[in-house]
Amino acid sequence: AHLHEMMALLTDPTLSFPHGEINDLREALSRIRIEGLFMDEAELFSLRKMLDYAAQLERFFAALDKTKYPLLSNSSQSERPVSNNFINDMISAIDKIIDRYGKMRDNASPELARIRKEISASQGSVSRALNAILRQAQAEGILDKDAAPTMREGRLVLPVPPAYKRKIGGIVHDESATGKTVFIEPQQVVEANNRIRELEGEERRERMRILLEITAKIRPAIPHILSTEHFLGDIDFLRAKALFGLDMQAIVPETTKHPMLDWREAYHPVLLLNFRRQGKTVVPLTIRLSNSEASNSPTGRPIGGTPSNNRILVISGPNAGGKSVCLKTVAMLQYMLQCGLAVPMNEASKMGFFKNLLIDIGDEQSIEDDLSTYSSHLRNMKHFVRYADAHTLLLIDEFGTGTEPLIGGAIAEAVLAQLNQQGAFGVITTHYSNLKHFAEQTDGVVNGAMLYDRGQLKPLFQLSIGQAGSSFAVEIARQIGLPETI
C-alpha cells in the first residue's frame, strides 16, 4: 500500500518530492558514545545535511492530501522519530560552527577567531619577507626569474640551486628528486614560521574543544538520530522501489494470503527493459495456478475455462520457444512481489504468497563435489520432496534431463507425482512425453504448450494452457537445412 501511494505521488504533477542527502553515520555515532571522542567537521556536515533532509520530508508529508495519500501523509507523525524542534536546534548548533562548505567557521568561537587572525597576519608577514629575499636573490642572479616560495613540511621555503645554498642563510628542509634544487627556509623567517607552528597547534586544540563541546550535545540524542537515519533509509528505499516500478510501468497487484497465481499479461522485467531500449515488443505471459479451495472462493477468477484445481503447470514446446522464459518470468515476478516490489503485469492480475520458492534452473555440475548434471538435479529433487508443501512454489527447468530418457522420464514422473500429492504449486518445463501424459491424466497438474507457427516455422512465444506442446524437431531440422534423406 505504501508503494502504491509512492508511485502515485511521484507521478503527481502537483507535487515535487524533496531531494536530500543520506549518509551512513552509524560508525561515527557508535564511536562518540565514548566520552572524549568527537565527530569531525565532515561528519557534522553529513549529519546536518541528513537532518535537513528529514525536516524537508516532514514538511512535505505533513502537507500531503490525507484522503489521497493516507499512509504517506501519516508517516511524518507515526514513523518519524524526532521532533521538528530537535532537528532545528541541532541544525542551528551545527551551522554556528560549520560553514556551507563543511569547514569550521573562523567565528566558531572568539578564541578560534583570534588564533586564525594571528595565523593569517603571521603568514602574510612571512610571505612578504620571503618575497623581499626572493627579489634580492633574483637581482643578484642567485635564483631564477621564475622561482617562487613553496611549502615544505608546513613551512614556507625558497627553491635554491645547491651551488648557492650558502649564499641564502637558513635551514635546508628538503631537496628535489634530481638533487638540482634544495629548499631553504631563510633565517629571517624562522622565528615567524615557528610562531605559525605554535598557532596551528593552538588552532587544533581549539577546534578539538569546539568539536568535543558540540559532540556532547549530540551524544544524548544518538538513539533519535539513528532512528531518523533508519527512517530516511526506509523512505529512500520506498522511493527507489517506486521509481523502478514506474520505469517498468509496473503495478502493485491485488494480493491474497493463500498461494495462487492469476496473472494477466505479465512481463519478465529484464526482457521488458532491454526490448524497450531496442524498440522491440515482449510477448506477455498469462497464467493461472490455484487449488480448488482458493478458486471456489468468492474472489476466484478462472482464465479461459482452465480447471480451478491446477496447481502444477507442465510446459512443453520447441527449443528456443520460450519455455524457460515463462519459467523465469514466474520465478522473477513472484520473488519481486515477495520482496515488496511492483510487478509488470495487467491490473486485472491477482497474486498470492508462498512460504517456499524452490528453484532448479541451469547446470550445477561440480568437479569439486563429484556431481554430474543429473546428480545435481537429483539432489535438488530430494530437497524439494523433503520440503515441498501446499505453500511451496516449484520452478524446475528441463525436468528429468541429464540421463537416459526412459529412466530419467520415469524418475521425473514419480517425483512429480509425489510433489503433486504434497499439494505444491509449480511451473515445470520438459520435452518428455510421459510427463505430458501424466499432466493430462492427473488432477492438480495441467499441460501448457508454447505455440509454434507451422506455416512460417517460427515460435510465437505464447503460452496456451490446457494442451501439451510439441518439440517440432522434424520441422526445425528441415528449417535449418538438414538433408531430406536424413
Identify the residue ranges that each predicted region occupies.
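SMC-family hinge/dimerization module
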Residues: 147-148, 152-183, 193, 255-284
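Long, charged, glycine-rich C-terminal linkers/tails
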Residues: 134-152, 242-265
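Extended, Lys/Arg-enriched charged tracts that mediate electrostatic binding to polyanionic substrates
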Residues: 114-164
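Short, exposed interaction patches on small structured surface elements
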Residues: 178-201, 464-486
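Amphipathic alpha-helical coiled-coil segments
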Residues: 3, 10, 47, 54, ...
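Conserved amphipathic alpha-helical "coupling/scaffold" segments
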Residues: 1-111, 115, 221-224, 228-242, ...
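Short hinge/gating elements
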Residues: 6, 102-115, 175-181, 196, ...
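ATPase nucleotide-binding head domains, primarily ABC-like/P-loop NTPase cores
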Residues: 248-249, 256-486
